[in-house]
Amino acid sequence: MTTNLLDFDLDGLAAFCERLGEKRFRATQLFRWIHQRGASDFDQMSDLAKSLREKLRGCAHVAGLQAISEHVSADGTVKWLFDVGDGNAVETVFIPEDDRGTLCISSQAGCAVGCRFCSTGHQGFSRNLTTGEILAQLWYAEHALRQRRGDGERVISNVVMMGMGEPLQNYAALVPALRVMLDDHGYGLSRRRVTVSTSGVVPMMDRLAQDCPVALAVSLHAPNDVLRDNLVPLNRKYPLHELLAACRRYLDHAPRDFITFEYCMLEGVNDQPEHARQLIDLVGRKAADGGVSCKFNLIPFNPFPASGLRRSPPAAVTAFAQLLSDAGIVTTVRKTRGDDIDAACGQLAGDVKDRTRVNERMAKLRTIEIKPVI
Protein backbone atom coordinates (compact mmCIF):
# COMPACT_ATOMS: atom_id res chain seq x y z
CA MET A 1 0.00 0.00 0.00
CA THR A 2 1.35 3.43 -0.93
CA THR A 3 1.17 6.59 1.19
CA ASN A 4 -1.22 9.46 0.43
CA LEU A 5 0.90 12.60 0.56
CA LEU A 6 -2.16 14.74 1.34
CA ASP A 7 -1.99 13.26 4.84
CA PHE A 8 1.22 15.19 5.63
CA ASP A 9 1.94 18.72 6.76
CA LEU A 10 5.35 20.02 5.64
CA ASP A 11 7.21 18.56 8.61
CA GLY A 12 5.56 15.20 8.04
CA LEU A 13 6.41 15.29 4.34
CA ALA A 14 10.01 16.22 5.15
CA ALA A 15 10.29 13.21 7.46
CA PHE A 16 8.82 11.02 4.71
CA CYS A 17 11.37 12.32 2.19
CA GLU A 18 14.22 11.81 4.63
CA ARG A 19 13.20 8.16 4.94
CA LEU A 20 13.67 8.00 1.17
CA GLY A 21 17.17 9.44 1.55
CA GLU A 22 16.19 12.92 0.31
CA LYS A 23 16.90 16.40 1.67
CA ARG A 24 14.22 18.59 3.27
CA PHE A 25 14.18 21.06 0.36
CA ARG A 26 12.83 18.25 -1.83
CA ALA A 27 9.84 18.01 0.50
CA THR A 28 9.25 21.75 0.08
CA GLN A 29 9.31 21.40 -3.71
CA LEU A 30 6.93 18.45 -3.56
CA PHE A 31 4.64 20.28 -1.13
CA ARG A 32 4.38 23.27 -3.47
CA TRP A 33 3.56 21.06 -6.46
CA ILE A 34 0.76 19.36 -4.57
CA HIS A 35 -0.88 22.29 -2.82
CA GLN A 36 0.00 25.37 -4.86
CA ARG A 37 -0.23 23.80 -8.32
CA GLY A 38 -2.69 21.00 -7.65
CA ALA A 39 -0.44 18.32 -9.15
CA SER A 40 -1.12 14.66 -8.47
CA ASP A 41 1.10 13.12 -11.18
CA PHE A 42 4.75 12.94 -10.14
CA ASP A 43 5.83 13.20 -13.78
CA GLN A 44 4.40 16.75 -13.81
CA MET A 45 6.82 17.79 -11.08
CA SER A 46 9.58 18.79 -13.44
CA ASP A 47 12.02 20.27 -10.92
CA LEU A 48 12.16 17.05 -8.90
CA ALA A 49 15.03 14.72 -9.68
CA LYS A 50 14.02 11.81 -11.89
CA SER A 51 15.32 9.41 -9.26
CA LEU A 52 13.01 10.93 -6.64
CA ARG A 53 10.02 10.76 -8.97
CA GLU A 54 10.74 7.08 -9.51
CA LYS A 55 10.92 6.49 -5.76
CA LEU A 56 7.63 8.33 -5.23
CA ARG A 57 5.84 6.32 -7.90
CA GLY A 58 6.72 3.18 -5.98
CA CYS A 59 5.67 4.26 -2.50
CA ALA A 60 3.36 7.29 -2.64
CA HIS A 61 0.36 8.85 -4.32
CA VAL A 62 -1.70 12.04 -4.14
CA ALA A 63 -5.32 10.99 -3.72
CA GLY A 64 -8.10 13.53 -3.60
CA LEU A 65 -11.77 12.72 -3.08
CA GLN A 66 -14.27 11.68 -5.72
CA ALA A 67 -16.93 14.34 -6.21
CA ILE A 68 -20.08 12.37 -6.89
CA SER A 69 -22.27 15.44 -7.23
CA GLU A 70 -21.96 19.17 -7.59
CA HIS A 71 -24.77 21.68 -7.31
CA VAL A 72 -24.72 25.41 -7.96
CA SER A 73 -27.19 27.66 -6.15
CA ALA A 74 -28.95 30.61 -7.72
CA ASP A 75 -26.72 32.84 -5.55
CA GLY A 76 -23.51 31.21 -6.83
CA THR A 77 -22.90 28.97 -3.83
CA VAL A 78 -21.42 25.61 -4.86
CA LYS A 79 -21.94 22.37 -2.94
CA TRP A 80 -19.99 19.17 -3.56
CA LEU A 81 -20.83 15.74 -2.21
CA PHE A 82 -17.64 13.71 -1.76
CA ASP A 83 -17.40 9.93 -1.43
CA VAL A 84 -15.19 8.97 1.52
CA GLY A 85 -15.80 5.23 1.24
CA ASP A 86 -17.73 2.59 3.15
CA GLY A 87 -21.04 4.20 2.29
CA ASN A 88 -20.07 7.56 3.78
CA ALA A 89 -20.27 10.96 2.15
CA VAL A 90 -19.31 14.47 3.24
CA GLU A 91 -20.30 17.83 1.87
CA THR A 92 -18.19 20.89 1.13
CA VAL A 93 -19.55 24.33 0.29
CA PHE A 94 -17.96 27.28 -1.53
CA ILE A 95 -19.51 30.69 -0.85
CA PRO A 96 -18.43 33.43 -3.27
CA GLU A 97 -18.64 37.08 -2.25
CA ASP A 98 -17.36 40.29 -3.80
CA ASP A 99 -14.36 40.56 -1.48
CA ARG A 100 -13.69 36.93 -0.58
CA GLY A 101 -14.27 33.30 -1.39
CA THR A 102 -15.04 31.10 1.61
CA LEU A 103 -14.83 27.31 1.69
CA CYS A 104 -16.81 25.46 4.36
CA ILE A 105 -15.06 22.14 5.09
CA SER A 106 -16.28 18.99 6.84
CA SER A 107 -14.18 17.27 9.51
CA GLN A 108 -16.27 14.14 10.14
CA ALA A 109 -18.74 11.93 8.31
CA GLY A 110 -21.78 12.76 10.38
CA CYS A 111 -21.56 14.24 13.87
CA ALA A 112 -21.83 12.84 17.38
CA VAL A 113 -22.78 16.09 19.14
CA GLY A 114 -26.45 15.90 18.14
CA CYS A 115 -27.53 19.54 18.30
CA ARG A 116 -31.32 19.68 18.00
CA PHE A 117 -31.35 22.28 15.21
CA CYS A 118 -28.71 20.67 12.97
CA SER A 119 -29.66 18.16 10.30
CA THR A 120 -26.13 16.73 10.25
CA GLY A 121 -26.44 15.83 13.92
CA HIS A 122 -29.66 13.95 13.18
CA GLN A 123 -27.72 11.84 10.65
CA GLY A 124 -25.57 10.38 13.41
CA PHE A 125 -21.82 9.79 13.49
CA SER A 126 -19.99 7.49 11.08
CA ARG A 127 -16.27 8.26 11.43
CA ASN A 128 -13.54 10.88 11.60
CA LEU A 129 -11.99 12.09 8.37
CA THR A 130 -8.24 11.75 7.87
CA THR A 131 -5.99 14.76 7.44
CA GLY A 132 -5.86 13.95 3.73
CA GLU A 133 -9.65 13.83 3.46
CA ILE A 134 -9.97 17.21 5.19
CA LEU A 135 -7.33 18.77 2.93
CA ALA A 136 -8.66 17.04 -0.18
CA GLN A 137 -11.79 19.20 0.05
CA LEU A 138 -9.68 22.37 -0.16
CA TRP A 139 -7.31 20.85 -2.73
CA TYR A 140 -10.17 19.84 -5.02
CA ALA A 141 -12.19 23.04 -4.66
CA GLU A 142 -9.29 25.48 -5.04
CA HIS A 143 -7.80 23.90 -8.13
CA ALA A 144 -11.11 23.03 -9.78
CA LEU A 145 -12.43 26.56 -9.35
CA ARG A 146 -9.12 28.12 -10.37
CA GLN A 147 -8.95 26.00 -13.52
CA ARG A 148 -12.51 26.85 -14.50
CA ARG A 149 -12.00 30.55 -13.92
CA GLY A 150 -8.96 30.33 -16.15
CA ASP A 151 -6.71 33.05 -14.73
CA GLY A 152 -4.71 30.97 -12.24
CA GLU A 153 -5.41 33.34 -9.35
CA ARG A 154 -6.33 32.09 -5.89
CA VAL A 155 -10.08 31.60 -5.52
CA ILE A 156 -10.41 30.61 -1.86
CA SER A 157 -9.32 33.28 0.61
CA ASN A 158 -11.07 31.99 3.74
CA VAL A 159 -11.64 28.54 5.22
CA VAL A 160 -14.21 27.78 7.89
CA MET A 161 -14.31 24.41 9.62
CA MET A 162 -18.09 24.60 9.84
CA GLY A 163 -19.15 21.69 7.66
CA MET A 164 -20.21 18.26 8.85
CA GLY A 165 -18.79 17.21 12.20
CA GLU A 166 -17.24 18.68 15.35
CA PRO A 167 -13.66 19.58 14.36
CA LEU A 168 -12.25 19.40 17.88
CA GLN A 169 -13.45 15.81 18.24
CA ASN A 170 -11.10 14.98 15.35
CA TYR A 171 -8.14 16.90 16.70
CA ALA A 172 -5.31 14.64 15.53
CA ALA A 173 -6.36 15.01 11.89
CA LEU A 174 -7.45 18.65 12.17
CA VAL A 175 -4.22 20.29 13.31
CA PRO A 176 -1.94 19.01 10.50
CA ALA A 177 -4.61 20.09 8.01
CA LEU A 178 -4.71 23.58 9.52
CA ARG A 179 -0.92 23.80 9.30
CA VAL A 180 -1.01 23.04 5.58
CA MET A 181 -3.65 25.74 5.08
CA LEU A 182 -1.45 28.27 6.89
CA ASP A 183 1.91 27.23 5.41
CA ASP A 184 3.33 29.70 2.89
CA HIS A 185 4.45 26.72 0.79
CA GLY A 186 0.89 25.36 0.94
CA TYR A 187 -2.17 27.62 0.75
CA GLY A 188 -0.65 30.56 2.61
CA LEU A 189 -3.84 31.56 4.40
CA SER A 190 -3.72 34.00 7.30
CA ARG A 191 -4.60 32.68 10.76
CA ARG A 192 -7.33 35.33 10.81
CA ARG A 193 -8.86 33.80 7.69
CA VAL A 194 -9.04 30.22 8.96
CA THR A 195 -11.82 29.61 11.47
CA VAL A 196 -12.50 26.53 13.57
CA SER A 197 -16.06 26.26 14.84
CA THR A 198 -16.75 24.22 17.95
CA SER A 199 -19.78 23.37 20.04
CA GLY A 200 -17.54 23.69 23.09
CA VAL A 201 -15.02 20.87 23.52
CA VAL A 202 -13.20 22.70 26.30
CA PRO A 203 -10.00 20.61 26.66
CA MET A 204 -9.39 20.71 22.91
CA MET A 205 -9.99 24.47 22.80
CA ASP A 206 -7.09 24.81 25.24
CA ARG A 207 -4.90 22.52 23.13
CA LEU A 208 -5.72 24.38 19.92
CA ALA A 209 -4.73 27.66 21.55
CA GLN A 210 -1.27 26.20 22.17
CA ASP A 211 -0.79 24.11 19.03
CA CYS A 212 -2.32 26.09 16.18
CA PRO A 213 -4.31 29.19 17.19
CA VAL A 214 -6.63 30.29 14.42
CA ALA A 215 -9.86 32.28 14.56
CA LEU A 216 -12.43 30.60 16.81
CA ALA A 217 -16.20 30.43 16.52
CA VAL A 218 -18.30 28.88 19.28
CA SER A 219 -21.76 27.46 18.68
CA LEU A 220 -23.51 29.05 21.66
CA HIS A 221 -27.22 29.06 20.75
CA ALA A 222 -28.52 29.58 24.29
CA PRO A 223 -27.98 32.06 27.15
CA ASN A 224 -28.34 29.62 30.05
CA ASP A 225 -27.42 26.04 30.89
CA VAL A 226 -30.98 24.72 31.09
CA LEU A 227 -31.75 25.72 27.51
CA ARG A 228 -28.31 24.88 26.16
CA ASP A 229 -28.43 21.42 27.73
CA ASN A 230 -31.48 20.81 25.55
CA LEU A 231 -30.17 22.37 22.32
CA VAL A 232 -26.48 21.39 22.54
CA PRO A 233 -26.12 18.16 24.57
CA LEU A 234 -22.35 18.68 24.94
CA ASN A 235 -23.22 21.46 27.40
CA ARG A 236 -24.03 18.80 29.99
CA LYS A 237 -20.32 17.90 29.98
CA TYR A 238 -18.88 21.40 29.54
CA PRO A 239 -21.38 23.93 30.94
CA LEU A 240 -21.36 27.61 30.12
CA HIS A 241 -19.05 28.78 32.91
CA GLU A 242 -16.37 26.30 31.74
CA LEU A 243 -16.93 27.21 28.08
CA LEU A 244 -16.62 30.95 28.67
CA ALA A 245 -13.49 30.47 30.77
CA ALA A 246 -11.96 28.49 27.89
CA CYS A 247 -12.90 31.31 25.49
CA ARG A 248 -11.09 33.84 27.67
CA ARG A 249 -8.00 31.61 27.78
CA TYR A 250 -8.12 31.17 24.01
CA LEU A 251 -8.07 34.94 23.47
CA ASP A 252 -4.60 35.07 25.02
CA HIS A 253 -3.33 33.25 21.90
CA ALA A 254 -5.91 34.01 19.19
CA PRO A 255 -5.13 35.94 15.99
CA ARG A 256 -8.31 37.97 16.55
CA ASP A 257 -9.20 39.86 19.72
CA PHE A 258 -12.69 38.40 19.91
CA ILE A 259 -14.56 35.11 19.82
CA THR A 260 -17.43 34.74 17.37
CA PHE A 261 -20.52 33.31 19.02
CA GLU A 262 -22.89 31.60 16.62
CA TYR A 263 -26.54 31.71 17.62
CA CYS A 264 -29.21 29.88 15.63
CA MET A 265 -32.50 31.78 15.94
CA LEU A 266 -35.37 29.43 16.84
CA GLU A 267 -38.89 30.79 17.07
CA GLY A 268 -40.21 30.76 20.63
CA VAL A 269 -37.19 28.82 21.88
CA ASN A 270 -34.21 31.19 22.20
CA ASP A 271 -35.29 34.35 20.36
CA GLN A 272 -37.15 36.34 23.01
CA PRO A 273 -35.99 39.69 24.47
CA GLU A 274 -35.32 37.96 27.79
CA HIS A 275 -32.88 35.62 26.04
CA ALA A 276 -31.02 38.60 24.59
CA ARG A 277 -30.81 40.22 28.02
CA GLN A 278 -29.45 36.98 29.47
CA LEU A 279 -26.79 36.89 26.75
CA ILE A 280 -25.79 40.45 27.54
CA ASP A 281 -25.41 39.51 31.20
CA LEU A 282 -23.51 36.35 30.24
CA VAL A 283 -20.85 37.80 27.95
CA GLY A 284 -21.19 41.58 28.06
CA ARG A 285 -19.30 42.13 31.29
CA LYS A 286 -15.59 42.87 31.51
CA ALA A 287 -13.41 39.78 31.22
CA ALA A 288 -12.34 40.12 34.85
CA ASP A 289 -16.00 39.82 35.82
CA GLY A 290 -16.65 36.77 33.63
CA GLY A 291 -17.39 38.40 30.28
CA VAL A 292 -15.83 37.62 26.89
CA SER A 293 -14.66 39.92 24.11
CA CYS A 294 -16.95 38.73 21.34
CA LYS A 295 -19.22 39.33 18.39
CA PHE A 296 -22.49 37.56 17.69
CA ASN A 297 -23.51 35.99 14.41
CA LEU A 298 -27.26 35.38 14.44
CA ILE A 299 -28.17 32.52 12.11
CA PRO A 300 -31.66 32.03 10.67
CA PHE A 301 -32.70 28.43 11.29
CA ASN A 302 -32.88 26.29 8.17
CA PRO A 303 -35.81 23.89 8.67
CA PHE A 304 -35.53 20.17 7.97
CA PRO A 305 -38.03 17.31 8.41
CA ALA A 306 -38.84 16.14 11.94
CA SER A 307 -36.85 18.92 13.65
CA GLY A 308 -39.95 20.26 15.40
CA LEU A 309 -38.41 23.74 15.20
CA ARG A 310 -39.24 26.90 13.26
CA ARG A 311 -37.20 29.82 11.95
CA SER A 312 -37.57 33.04 13.94
CA PRO A 313 -39.53 35.73 12.06
CA PRO A 314 -37.33 38.48 10.58
CA ALA A 315 -38.78 41.06 12.96
CA ALA A 316 -37.78 38.96 15.96
CA VAL A 317 -34.24 38.54 14.62
CA THR A 318 -33.94 42.28 14.01
CA ALA A 319 -35.20 43.15 17.49
CA PHE A 320 -32.86 40.59 19.08
CA ALA A 321 -29.88 41.96 17.16
CA GLN A 322 -30.77 45.50 18.18
CA LEU A 323 -30.81 44.62 21.87
CA LEU A 324 -27.33 43.11 21.62
CA SER A 325 -26.02 46.02 19.56
CA ASP A 326 -27.46 48.57 22.00
CA ALA A 327 -25.48 46.81 24.74
CA GLY A 328 -22.27 47.39 22.78
CA ILE A 329 -21.94 43.87 21.38
CA VAL A 330 -21.05 43.71 17.68
CA THR A 331 -23.85 41.70 16.08
CA THR A 332 -24.47 40.52 12.53
CA VAL A 333 -27.23 38.47 10.96
CA ARG A 334 -25.92 35.77 8.66
CA LYS A 335 -27.20 35.98 5.14
CA THR A 336 -28.69 32.62 4.18
CA ARG A 337 -26.72 31.25 1.25
CA GLY A 338 -27.29 28.09 -0.77
CA ASP A 339 -30.48 27.01 0.96
CA ASP A 340 -32.00 26.03 -2.39
CA ILE A 341 -29.35 23.29 -2.64
CA ASP A 342 -29.36 22.35 1.07
CA ALA A 343 -25.98 24.04 1.57
CA ALA A 344 -27.03 26.55 4.22
CA CYS A 345 -25.99 26.37 7.86
CA GLY A 346 -27.31 23.23 9.56
CA GLN A 347 -28.35 21.58 6.30
CA LEU A 348 -25.16 19.71 5.50
CA ALA A 349 -26.66 16.27 5.85
CA GLY A 350 -28.71 16.96 2.71
CA ASP A 351 -30.95 13.94 2.26
CA VAL A 352 -28.22 11.57 3.45
CA LYS A 353 -29.72 10.10 6.61
CA ASP A 354 -28.18 6.69 7.08
CA ARG A 355 -25.71 4.31 5.48
CA THR A 356 -28.33 2.57 3.36
CA ARG A 357 -29.53 5.84 1.86
CA VAL A 358 -25.94 6.98 1.35
CA ASN A 359 -25.27 3.90 -0.78
CA GLU A 360 -28.51 4.33 -2.73
CA ARG A 361 -27.84 8.00 -3.36
CA MET A 362 -24.24 7.43 -4.44
CA ALA A 363 -25.29 4.77 -6.92
CA LYS A 364 -27.80 7.20 -8.38
CA LEU A 365 -25.51 10.24 -8.41
CA ARG A 366 -22.67 8.44 -10.15
CA THR A 367 -24.89 8.30 -13.21
CA ILE A 368 -25.43 12.07 -13.20
CA GLU A 369 -23.09 14.41 -15.02
CA ILE A 370 -21.47 16.94 -12.70
CA LYS A 371 -22.69 20.47 -13.35
CA PRO A 372 -20.10 23.13 -14.15
CA VAL A 373 -19.34 26.04 -11.85
CA ILE A 374 -20.69 29.27 -13.30
From Swiss-Prot:
Residues 97-340 form the Radical SAM core domain. Keywords: 4Fe-4S, Cytoplasm, Disulfide bond, Iron, Iron-sulfur, Metal-binding, Methyltransferase, rRNA processing, S-adenosyl-L-methionine, Transferase, tRNA processing. The active site is at 91 (proton acceptor), 345 (s-methylcysteine intermediate). One of its GO terms (molecular function) is metal ion binding. GO terms for cellular component: cytoplasm. Coiled coil: none annotated. GO terms for biological process: rRNA base methylation; tRNA methylation. [4Fe-4S] cluster binds at residues 111, 115, 118. NCBIfam families: rRNA_mod_RlmN (TIGR00048). Specifically methylates position 2 of adenine 2503 in 23S rRNA and position 2 of adenine 37 in tRNAs. m2A2503 modification seems to play a crucial role in the proofreading step occurring at the peptidyl transferase center and thus would serve to optimize ribosomal fidelity. Reaction proceeds by a ping-pong mechanism involving intermediate methylation of a conserved cysteine residue. Belongs to the radical SAM superfamily. RlmN family. This is Dual-specificity RNA methyltransferase RlmN. It comes from Acidovorax sp. (strain JS42).
